[in-house]
Amino acid sequence: MEREKLDRLYLFLISILPISIVAGPSISLFNVLLLTIFFLINFKSSEIEIQNKFLIYLLITLYVYLIFNSFISIDYKEGIYRNLGFIRFIILFIAINFFFKISKNENKFLNFWSIIILIVIFDSFIEFGFGTNLLGYGDDIYVDRIVSFFKDEPIVGAYLLGFNFVIIGYLFERFYKENLKLKLALFLILFILVGCILITGERSNGIK
């Protein structure tokens, strides 16, 4: 596969990752599987060296530990099925790392991620203030919990937390050296993001 086509494919699959998660577990899993398959096919013929090898080894060690822990748990069947799926996140991490090595468009997907996260934050505050979000989803099932675009799953806090450090780190790295107004805007975004996680009603994520 030509490098330019590979770049566009990776850019598309990685860019829609936040949207695929909102769309549902099946779609997000399909997206991750596609990303993983294309990565494995192209990495085999690539001479590019993966960075952050220590972190990869650390994730693999954690994965082996989870599998071992599943075998010694009471309900080992449920644990083993759940923990076997963790391997896709390790491969996803490596695939994104690979994308940064081959692509000159990494800022494009981070910009897109930032826009999606800001939309979810805005939607969550709309639901918090008016009882329903932009699509009419509300607290029909979960009282005092924000569901946003997830409709019947109160996981928006975990969703935002998952992208929190990536988005904030990217924005600070790109704009922090700019003028004072941009610095204040960055801290305001950080404050709003943390506040949004807190109002979702997911206590464990708020504590984190």
Predicted regions and their residues:
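Transmembrane signal-anchor hairpin modules in multi-pass inner-membrane enzymes, especially those
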Residues: 1-78, 98-114, 170-184
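Alpha-helical transmembrane segments of multi-pass inner-membrane proteins
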Residues: 17, 67, 91, 107-141, ...
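Membrane-embedded alpha-helical segments of multi-pass membrane proteins
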Residues: 23-45, 83-94, 156-167, 207-208
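Membrane-interface helix caps and helix-loop-helix hairpins in membrane proteins
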Residues: 72-81, 198-203
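Non-cytosolic membrane-interface motifs at loop->transmembrane helix junctions
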Residues: 78-85, 140-147
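Short, flexible active-site loop motifs that bind/organize anionic cofactors or intermediates
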Residues: 82, 96-99, 146, 196, ...
